[in-house]
Amino acid sequence: MLNLIKNVIRSLKSAKIALIALTFLIFVAVGGFVLLNNTVNNFNAAFNYVTHTGKLSNAIINERYDFGKLEFQEQTNNSQNSSDSFTLTLTNDSRTSFINNALRTNPSLYEGLVTQTFSYQNKTEMTEKTNIVNQSKIIAANNLNNALSKDKQLLVSGQLEKLNAVFREYKAINITDKSVFKKLIVSEPNDLVNSLVIFDGQNLSSSKQSDFNNFLNQFNEIKSKGKDNLSTTLKTGQYQAFLQTLFDYAQASETTLKDQLQKLISNPDSSETNQVKNLFDTPSTLTNIGGQLTLQWTENSLTKQIVIFDPSSYETIVAPGNWTYQQQLGKEVYPDINNWESIKKLPLEQFESEFLKIDQKYKISIDNIDYLVIGVGISPDFVYPVFSASLIVPNIENEQLYYVNQTGYERTFSSFLTNPVETAIVARLINLESDLNTINQWAVENMSWPTNIKAAYSSSDTTNILNLLAARTVFIPNLINTINLVALFLTIAILTVAIIVSILILISYLKKNTEQIGILKANGLSGKKINLSLLIFGLIPAIVGAISGYSFGIGFQDVAIHLFSNYWFIPTATSSFSVVGLLFFSLFVILIMSSISLLVGSIILKKDVVKILKHDSEFKVSRLGLSSKKLFARFGIMTRFRVALAFNAPWKLVFLTLMSSFTMMILNLSFATKDSFENAQSKTNLTNQNHQYEFELASATTQSGLLKWQLFAELGTTDKRSESSVKLANKRMDISNVDASKDWKNQQVINFLSDASGFSNDLNYLENIVQSKIGLDYSLGFNNIVSNPWRLSETLMPTNQASASNTAFQNFLKAIITINPSQGSQFIKQTQDPLTKRFIYAIDSDKALKNNNEQNGSQNHLTLNDDFAKFLYSQFELIKKSGNASNEDLNAIDFENPQTIRDFYNKYNALPPLDYKLSFNVIGLPKETIAGQIDTPKYGFLTLHGEYQNTPIKIKGIKDWKDKVDNLGPVLSDQNNHIINQELFKNYSFDPLIVNNSAAKKYQLAIGSEINIAVNNSFKRIDNKIINQDPLVNATFRVVGINNSAHDPEFFTSYSTAFKVLEYPNEWFVKKLPFNSFYANSLLSFVQSTSLFSESGIFPATSSFSTNNTVLVELIKKTINYKNGQMNQTSSNDSSKKENYQKLQKALGISTDLEISKVNEYVAILARVYNGLPYNSTISFISNVAANNALFGNIANTTKQIQAVVIAVIIPIIMLIILLVSTTLIQELKKIAIRLKALGYSNLKILASFLSIYIPLFAFGLLISIPFSIYLIALHNEVIFASSSIFLDAFLSFESAIGSMLVLLAVLSITFVLNWLELNKIKIDKEIKNS
């Protein structure tokens, strides 16, 4: 047996090429599998670790409650001259449905909060009493607000507890710091949802925010009972911890105070409280600002303070994606956590001193506010760190995420009160769908969201415009699944090919050694022993290939991870080298190779010795070779000989042909898809090349009438149009002595008398109104009533939009100061934050408002001061002039750089449109959308919302934009790049439709196909809903063209068709008045304004339709009373009241007289028909072309990278196989080559004969590869479409087929050269002797 093994080892030298090839195949198979499998496992492990450890939420709830104005008034029966106290009561028009619900739910608590009694504090002067009353109104409002905002029975948190859900509040603030976007995200170590997962360093410490809140409550409790009752208060309450905190944080110099506090802690009966009482005197204040509590009091005319701070507010965790970049800048995680814990125990002054000493490399700065980096981590809701709705492609250099605890957040938030914030409740629901339905049903009655926005939705819901979490979490699983799919396919393919090739190589080797095998059997050795000795042939490549392949796969994991670095931001551990893993793969490969060797060997060694030796001494032509030779009987002998050679080894020929076909198929796929993504993106971009954004709006109803519009810069101006359907009401009153107000009759500015009356009496008080913070954010007082209209306005705005209005307000005032410091400083106050050195701007109310009764000190502020009103309208006029500015100049404004504001002003003598607008039934449009039109925006169009095959779809009813200059509309083109827009505007007897490639693919549509759509946004849908009929409209369309765009299904029809299907009145068609969508190159309509739309056509100053809403009930009563003649004669002649009555009838769908006794029935109808809310957000969806392109590019690049890796691995393997098998095939003809050489044939002629085997290879290879290439390319297109909704029109071209054949020919030419070199070495006499 030993001799047999030695003989096999010696014979290996002649098969070195085959051994190298087999070793390489095993190396690639094992290495590829280990690398790709480990990469997928590593990604999955990292993602699952973050999502499971961090407890990823599956639901989001956006809260929005209508607390109302919370305005209190003094009860009229108070006798200020004789009584020591007074009572404040919540005004009737402040009692929203939410507050009324609170009164029903918990009357014992809220009855005492809507009516509160206060002391005059022994004051006798009328002015002093008035001041106390005004201060008490603020306190009463705060008391009620605090109770409402924390009452779980009223808020959604109570509903979540009933559902046994785990939840928490998510909060983040966006800050622009020197052109770098920074997001500060709140995280606490005890978070049960979306908690931080730490990869390096330490987690954040728990904040003291709850301790601060408790301390504040206890302070207010003690102070409210009076300093003179301090001893009694301390005896009856549990205030030891409170007093201990005061003692701990009081300065060491306050020896007397600390001594008295210490005595009170041990003995509440202590009589030494003189200095402690000062802390609770009337002038003392306790504020919670900047992450610390500051208690200030006056003692002997000196202001003193105790600062209770939270050192953990100085800690931060950096997101790992950003940390990779920060490390390049020299940043490090603070390593000495014990020292940090020691520093945190120091008093404030010492703490700040020690904090300053810490090297800056351990800190990050948020606009000069330093935080110590104690760790690196991520929460599962930011695994794909999308920064904001306008920045959806992560950029680790310019978009930075930092985690801080609650007090750490307050440190920065207090300096950026006007910056955009993200807030929501994130939750893990047990029964997701049913729990979401439960919450949304509850929210309809208890929240004030528009009907087109759900309060609660799934974290993965990509259709919700408020859901950024979907973009942050959905992409990663899709990426992993794609890699996993490719890895599985590639591994199976390589292993299959490796096994097949191994079989062929072993057969070739055994046949090549037939003579030796025959001699051994003739000498009496059994076939089993010979077969076992041949195992060594498979063991060497198996062991070497498996070990090197496994090592390669383990060693190159980082390279594979880096391949996806543009999309992968989670720290990912690589699998370590494992002896067990190595042994497993080695034994697995050895087992396969041994099995193949034993199987092949047993088949060959079954033959009789005589037959083995006989067949070895002659060249036997196969039956296929003989048969094929007969087809060429009329040709010469050499031709017939070459035909016989070509078909002599049929199985090898079949395999070689298959491998060649496979090679050409892969090459054809590579060539065909080389630019397919770019072509698809180019065609898609062509459709939307003329605009950057597409806005979808609320659709008009018979009740609402048309949505009104103005040039954005002119929002609020007096409307001079004559077309009644689109003209605004112009119903605001002028300001006497201020001529400019006549030009701004739709811009609401403060006027107490008209606003108080309108709020309480006018059902359409807000119709066509345009509001802004600068015009309304003032507290007006008259007869002990205080009103601030902007508070009401903010309750109607989503939190992020209210925050955006505050940011815009700051920018507006800053711009005014920048261009005209002297005039601006007359009315604008600037205060500098001591920490960040940033300026905070505010209107000086004392100079902005009139005081109509200065002599008696009652502070009856009723209207704007005339000088300020002139100043205010001059700013509106400056903004109006910016309507001529280019988008490039508007986008160039940088509020951190005042020079850009000056440059804009110098160029246009205007201010940018900085004033954030809140508008009702009117929307501001960019000038390019309007395009000089008067009654309808030129690039406004109609969108049909409907359903087809149980899938929601949108059909865009576009206009016939023939001009090419400044055309914002879509460019529709067919596969020949011919513009086909005009196909929609021909005269048809049917409704035409153009679909894009994706829609045609998804719904199997072609030109001539008909589809039936159930449209749900028709003009008369509310009419049908009122009478409980189906609001859907069925429409049938016929496809007249297929547009080239390739991403997501798109449908287009003509404006006239959409107009007809939506059932608009015919008189509106001539001027094309209706529109519910528009194209634009600016986001002004969204980022600089909030537009609200009423489907009912009524515009009350309230945010809900509910029988509990006393404001609404009273308004309806007063509107009905007008008709019943119960109002005075002067009012009864008011045409607006008549109009309000008619609009109410239309909203209710009642043509007969309304009855006062049925008010609650009418409110119930409004609640049912309009889903409980008077207003929808006018803007329902925005399509961002650049963002869509970026998403398209991300998907395309990821897919292309994976595809490139696959092809780069497969092609070399297959080519090596072809080279090896073809060489082996020719080597088997070596004995014939010797005889032909002896007959005088040259090496070239001999090789030419042998190369005849390539003729059928090419012929059959092409026959097989072409149809299968077509199928493979189609399959590739199908997979891409199914996974990403991208339609690729990759196809097999003649050039691709020729190119792949030439590549194959180049590989086979290597065989020609190698065999030619070997033939030159042959010595005829020696070879004949050996044979």
From Swiss-Prot:
User: What cystine pairs are annotated?
Assistant: none
Q: Where in the cell is it found?
A: Cell membrane
Name a Pfam family for this protein: FtsX
- Topologically, how does it sit relative to the membrane? Multi-pass membrane protein
Presence of keyword Membrane: yes
Q: Which GO terms describe its molecular function?
A: transmembrane transporter activity
Instruction: Quote the InterPro entries the UniProt record gives.
Output: ABC3_permease_C (IPR003838), Macrolide_Exporter_MacB (IPR050250)
Keywords attached to this entry: Cell membrane, Membrane, Transmembrane, Transmembrane helix, Transport
Tell me where it mainly resides. membrane
Q: Does the keyword Transmembrane helix apply?
A: yes
The molecule here is called Uncharacterized ABC transporter permease MG064
Q: What organism is listed for this UniProt entry?
A: Mycoplasma genitalium (strain ATCC 33530 / DSM 19775 / NCTC 10195 / G37) (Mycoplasmoides genitalium)
